[in-house]
């Protein structure tokens, strides 16, 4: 087998017919500027071809289910293996998907609990065991010799009534004695029982003394007792001790029943095991009182009840007024000053008590009726669930929030699953073990106390769980819990989870293609990730990693630098060789940064800010340990800390949502905190994340930044357009008039091919230009509207240099380093980093008030060091205008450029959530307890 992957003539996207050789069974890093063509080479060429060749070997029937497998634009690729891609885009947003289900650890846990778990009565009556008649006989014979006993069959347990028919049936069946409420009676002499009291009735089946030769008689009596007692029997040993036995998993005292233990009982995705209240989601949509009564200092008359404030009719305010008058509640008293009973009446209704309601609507319709008062919470709930109107449902949804399910307490499972414990009654149930961090979970497995028999059964299962947890630990995810919803994971976290799953599969001879696995990972955990990658390589796999992280590049076996620029200025192989060889290559920008010839300088001075703060007190969501944090305004702030230390919780769940709630009246509830002050010092909150700028190909840089409006205005003012009577709408490809109707302005037509992938062909009428021929006859400076959309930002800047309004907006796109994208490039083809910078560009051309707060979560994702230098210049422009920029970041070049650092930690998960250090980078670098400070110190000295 050849030891290289040889690629000839790769032309996907911006690749310029390149030839490249990649050594097999090595750790290969592909790097280059954002947009240079790294992903085009790794994913759209190598992975796409490896995947396509595998799928081609399947039957036509199987192929139809595997979707799009186009042949990449490449002449030939030799030496390919089956390819597995681990990217960041395929995180499941399904609320039923958790870390445990994605890693398949849940499957093994379910097996463990089904095989060695013991159910315990939820009412505190001890272990629930199922015993056959044979096992019961053995246990009875093991009692001390000469023990006197009677065998009883329980037939009434804690039931009210006189039970006369039951005594008649017992007599008819030939039994002589019964025990009623602990006293023995002849069945014909039972006193009359009280109707209103609970009673226990057992039939005396036999009386015995434990001695040799009673096995046969005992066996018959036990079987008879089980038959009569519906699978239950009691042994009364005459010295006051009672033994309870059951054929079923059922508590002999209270009757709490557990089905046979099998893995499906412990699955929250199966009706058999899921919580009946929340259907296994762990959360339930409930009416949130804080949203229903946003201002408790208001009275009912002043509109304390938000859902019932008059919008289009006075129906509910009238009902409220008449009901309160009838029940004697003062409408002028502030809501918070009402008695508890009065508040309950307003919120949850009057039960069966009625009031007289009289209402005439605007159309003369009349209601004159005695009805119970519904209560505002009950009303919102009913209207949400019963309405057929999407509008009403959305309005009611605004007063509701996802709260932890009160039945299962967020564990997602029913009582029967949660009563099963491993390692005795004090051991955890499956819900509790899923709430542990991976590090604690590993420790618990070491300390699990099992009997010899249980240990033998559990050994292979525990090994599988232990191995998988260890892999997760090794890629820096020790702070995650198995119950964490997959949809809440960052791109880097979900990628490392899939990486851990792949390491666990122990495959060899596979080609793995990874997309920036170091995203969201602190420098401290980077070494463990690189070790994991090397482990995969040592199994005999080839790893191609698209990465910008300097440590990963230096530890790679082979480095490929794609460039020299981005977009049409990239797509060539600038350097290929060992990291040392690339570092010596003068043409390679990456090489210049690796060798230290190029670097991002440390700012000469730190800004002092405007002296104002936003202060949060008592932040206690997730793992935050009641923090008091001050965010100085007018500065560039970096929030740092190891993965899982609480950065996203503090910034995204608390600060961002609390500010949005005050500024934008946002209904999204912030995480737990005591108080927040200083919001009055800012006017705008701008969240700049990496989500796409548009979900359809109709959205593009020109439409997103608003420059397309100005360009269409310009075309509408040309002489030709005026003569023809064209307005600016004529130059939109989204509405009828100017667009090509054959393709509805898409420029392409989709042809469904069933057993082959869908084919997209350029529209035959407009040839991919989106507009009809009449519209394209209008020119500005000899270019029509379609030709303008095909221009790169750099070209458009020169073309529109005489029109300041347009040039200013296009300049901002160039300033964020996107000079290579075309104005009409579909938004769906932009990477996360490009989308984020496009959002920055659209902010740059807005007039600055100097009172904005910009929040960016890991803005360096997908960025080369050279791109980061450009990004920092843009962010510093915002701060120099008096605004505040807050980034969550691990990249040391960004951290060292900040004015103020808030470092959380010291560890992730339960070991984090504290402030380890705050201050300038120089101050944080001196704090010995700070991992960030340790790495920052080295960086500042460079």
Swiss-Prot record:
Keywords assigned by UniProt, alphabetized: ATP-binding, Cytoplasm, DNA damage, DNA excision, DNA repair, DNA-binding, Excision nuclease, Metal-binding, Nucleotide-binding, Repeat, SOS response, Zinc, Zinc-finger
Pfam families, per database record: UvrA_DNA-bind, UvrA_inter
Gene Ontology terms for molecular function: ATP binding; ATP hydrolysis activity; DNA binding; excinuclease ABC activity; zinc ion binding
Residue numbers binding ATP: 32-39, 641-648
ABC transporter domain: residues covered: 308-589, 609-937
Keyword RNA-binding: no
One BP annotation, GO: nucleotide-excision repair
Matches recorded under InterPro entries: AAA+_ATPase, ABC_transporter-like_ATP-bd, ABC_transporter-like_CS, P-loop_NTPase, UvrA, UvrA_DNA-bd, UvrA_inter
Membrane-spanning residues: none
Highest taxon in the source lineage: Bacteria
GO CC annotation terms, alphabetical: cytoplasm; excinuclease repair complex
PROSITE patterns registered for this protein in UniProt: ABC_TRANSPORTER_1, ABC_TRANSPORTER_2
Location(s) in or outside the cell: Cytoplasm
SUPFAM superfamilies noted in UniProt: P-loop containing nucleoside triphosphate hydrolases (SSF52540)
Zn finger limits (C4-type): 251-278, 740-766
Subunit structure: Forms a heterotetramer with UvrB during the search for lesions.
PANTHER family in the cross-refs: UVRABC SYSTEM PROTEIN A
Function summary: The UvrABC repair system catalyzes the recognition and processing of DNA lesions. UvrA is an ATPase and a DNA-binding protein. A damage recognition complex composed of 2 UvrA and 2 UvrB subunits scans DNA for abnormalities. When the presence of a lesion has been verified by UvrB, the UvrA molecules dissociate.
Family: Belongs to the ABC transporter superfamily. UvrA family.
Protein name: UvrABC system protein A
Protein encoded by which gene: uvrA
């Amino acid at each position: 087998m050849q030891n290289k992957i040889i690629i000839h003539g790769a032309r996907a996207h911006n690749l310029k017919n390149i030839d490249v050789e990649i050594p097999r069974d090595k750790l290969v890093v592909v790097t280059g500027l954002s947009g240079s063509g790294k992903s085009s080479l790794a994913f759209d060429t190598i992975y796409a071809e490896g995947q396509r060749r595998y799928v081609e070997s399947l039957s036509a029937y199987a192929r139809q289910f595997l979707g799009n497998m186009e042949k990449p634009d490449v002449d030939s690729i030799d030496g390919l293996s089956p390819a597995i891609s681990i990217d960041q885009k395929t995180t499941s947003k399904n609320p039923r998907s958790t870390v445990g289900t994605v890693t398949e650890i849940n499957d093994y846990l379910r097996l463990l609990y089904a095989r060695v778990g013991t159910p315990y009565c939820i009412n505190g009556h001890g272990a629930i065991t199922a015993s056959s008649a044979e096992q019961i006989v053995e246990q009875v014979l093991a009692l001390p010799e000469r023990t006197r006993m009677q065998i009883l069959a329980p037939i009434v347990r804690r039931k009210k009534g006189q039970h006369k028919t039951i005594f008649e049936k017992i007599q008819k069946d030939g039994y002589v004695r019964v025990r009623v409420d602990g006293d023995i009676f002849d069945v014909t002499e039972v006193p009359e029982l009280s109707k209103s009291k609970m009673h226990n009735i057992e039939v005396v089946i036999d009386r015995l003394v434990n001695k040799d030769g009673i096995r046969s008689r005992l066996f018959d009596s036990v079987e008879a007792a089980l038959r009569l007692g519906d699978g239950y029997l009691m042994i009364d040993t005459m010295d006051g001790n009672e033994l309870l036995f059951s054929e079923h998993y059922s508590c002999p005292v209270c009757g709490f029943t557990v089905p046979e233990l099998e893995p499906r009982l412990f699955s929250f995705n199966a009706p058999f095991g899921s919580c009946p209240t929340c259907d296994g989601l762990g959360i339930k949509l409930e009416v949130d009182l804080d949203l229903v009564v946003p201002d408790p200092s208001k009275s009912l008359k002043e509109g304390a009840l938000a859902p019932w404030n008059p919008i289009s009719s006075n129906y509910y305010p009238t009902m409220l007024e008449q009901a309160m008058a009838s029940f004697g509640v003062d409408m002028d008293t502030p809501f918070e000053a009402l008695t508890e009973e009065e508040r309950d009446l307003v919120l949850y209704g009057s039960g069966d008590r009625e009031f007289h309601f009289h209402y005439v609507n605007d159309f003369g319709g009349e209601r004159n009726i005695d009805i119970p008062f519904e209560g505002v919470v009950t009303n919102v709930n009913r209207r949400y669930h019963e309405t057929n109107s999407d509008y009403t449902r959305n309005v009611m949804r605004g007063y509701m929030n996802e709260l932890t399910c009160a039945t299962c307490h967020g564990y997602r499972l029913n009582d029967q699953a949660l009563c099963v414990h491993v390692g005795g009654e004090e051991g955890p149930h499956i819900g509790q073990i899923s709430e542990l961090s991976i590090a604690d979970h590993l420790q618990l497995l070491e300390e699990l106390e099992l009997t010899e028999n249980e240990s033998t059964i559990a050994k292979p299962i525990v090994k599988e769980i232990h191995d998988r947890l260890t892999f997760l630990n090794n890629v820096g995810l020790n702070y995650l819990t198995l119950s964490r919803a997959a949809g809440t994971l960052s791109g880097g976290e979900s990628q490392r989870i899939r990486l851990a799953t792949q390491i666990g599969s122990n495959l060899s001879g596979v080609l793995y293609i990874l997309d920036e696995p170091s995203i969201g990972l602190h420098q401290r955990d980077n070494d463990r990730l690189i070790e994991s990658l090397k482990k995969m390589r040592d199994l005999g796999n080839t790893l191609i990693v698209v990465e910008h992280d300097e440590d990963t590049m230096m530890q790679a076996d082979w480095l490929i630098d794609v460039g020299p620029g981005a977009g049409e200025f990239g797509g060539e192989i600038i350097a290929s060789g060992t990291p040392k060889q690339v570092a010596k290559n003068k043409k390679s920008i990456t090489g210049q940064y690796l060798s230290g010839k190029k670097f991002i300088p440390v700012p000469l001075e730190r800004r002092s800010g405007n002296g104002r703060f936003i202060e949060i007190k008592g932040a206690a969501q997730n793992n935050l340990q009641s923090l008091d944090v001050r965010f100085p305004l007018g500065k560039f702030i970096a929030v740092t800390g190891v993965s899982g230390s609480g950065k996203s919780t503090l910034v995204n769940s608390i600060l961002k949502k609390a500010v949005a709630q005050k500024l934008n009246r946002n209904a999204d509830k912030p995480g737990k905190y005591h108080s927040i002050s200083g919001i009055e010092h800012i006017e705008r909150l701008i969240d700049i994340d990496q989500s796409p700028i548009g979900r359809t190909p109709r959205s593009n840089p020109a439409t997103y930044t608003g420059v397309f409006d100005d360009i269409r205005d310009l075309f509408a003012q040309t002489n030709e357009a005026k003569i023809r009577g064209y307005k600016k709408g004529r130059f939109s490809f989204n509405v009828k008039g100017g667009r090509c109707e054959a393709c509805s302005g898409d420029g392409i037509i989709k042809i469904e091919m069933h057993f082959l992938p869908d084919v997209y062909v350029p529209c035959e009428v407009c040839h991919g230009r989106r507009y009809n021929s009449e519209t394209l006859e209008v020119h500005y400076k000899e270019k029509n509207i379609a030709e303008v959309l095909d221009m790169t930002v750099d070209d458009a800047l020169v073309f529109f240099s005489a029109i300041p309004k347009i040039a200013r907006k296009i300049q901002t796109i160039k300033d964020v380093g996107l000079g290579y994208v075309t104005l009409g490039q579909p938004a769906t083809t932009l990477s996360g980093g490009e989308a984020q910078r496009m959002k920055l560009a659209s902010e740059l051309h807005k007039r600055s008030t100097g009172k904005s707060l910009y929040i960016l979560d890991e803005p360096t994702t997908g960025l080369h060091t050279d791109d980061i230098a450009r990004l920092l210049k843009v962010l510093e422009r915002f701060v120099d205008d008096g605004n505040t920029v807050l980034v969550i970041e691990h990249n040391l070049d960004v951290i060292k450029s900040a004015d103020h650092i808030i470092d959380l930690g010291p560890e992730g998960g339960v070991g984090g959530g504290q402030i380890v250090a705050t201050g300038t980078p120089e101050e944080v670098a001196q704090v010995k307890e700070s991992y960030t400070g340790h790495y920052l110190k080295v960086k500042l000295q460079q």
